[in-house]
Swiss-Prot record:
Organism expressing this protein natively: Cupriavidus pinatubonensis (strain JMP 134 / LMG 1197)
InterPro entries associated with the record: Mechanosensitive_channel_CS, MS_channel, MSC/AndL, MscL_channel
Protein name per UniProt: Large-conductance mechanosensitive channel
Gene for this chain: mscL
Matching PROSITE patterns: MSCL
One of the record's GO molecular function terms: mechanosensitive monoatomic ion channel activity
Upper classification of the organism: Bacteria, Pseudomonadati, Pseudomonadota, Betaproteobacteria, Burkholderiales
Self-association and partners: Homopentamer.
């Protein structure tokens, strides 16, 4: 089998296609979570804490060149090392929300799977069948 046909067989398996669909949907869902965090949650947290924009919370680790604006983007473009803890906080909140949503989805899936009834055991054979089997086994042991 050639390498190309092996790859085609591998790529067309159901699991690989399911994984690809999952990755694409996950990427789109990640954008939704980013928007929820950046546009809805972080402004509320920023309002409570007193800073409206977490993305501009940083500490410079070196002296910036004279005349450089004190914004995160300008300092990064100027090559000034910065400790951007506000951006990190936003990413951590993103992760926690995404992990919680995935937890809820897995929990719901497990509940649905647990609710499926297990296949019932077959009922025991009637007593007359049991007696007939015992008689049959007894006759087998008596024959020479």
């Amino acid at each position: 089998m050639s390498m190309m046909s092996e790859f085609k067989t591998f790529a067309m398996r159901g699991n690989v296609i399911d994984l690809a669909v999952g990755v694409i949907i996950g990427a789109a869902f990640g954008k939704i979570v980013d928007s929820v965090v950046n546009d809805l949650i972080m402004p509320v947290i920023g309002r409570i804490v007193g800073k409206l924009d977490f993305s501009n919370m940083f500490v410079t680790l070196a002296e910036p060149p004279p005349g450089t604006p004190m914004t995160l983007d300008a300092l990064k473009k100027a090559g000034v090392p910065v400790f951007a803890y506000g951006n990190f906080l936003t990413i951590v909140v993103n992760f926690v929300i995404l992990a919680f949503i995935i937890f809820l989805m897995v929990r719901a899936f497990n509940k649905m799977r647990a609710e499926e009834p297990a296949p019932a055991e077959p009922p025991p054979p009637p007593e007359d069948i049991v007696l007939l089997r015992e008689i049959r086994d007894s006759l087998k042991t008596r024959q020479p």
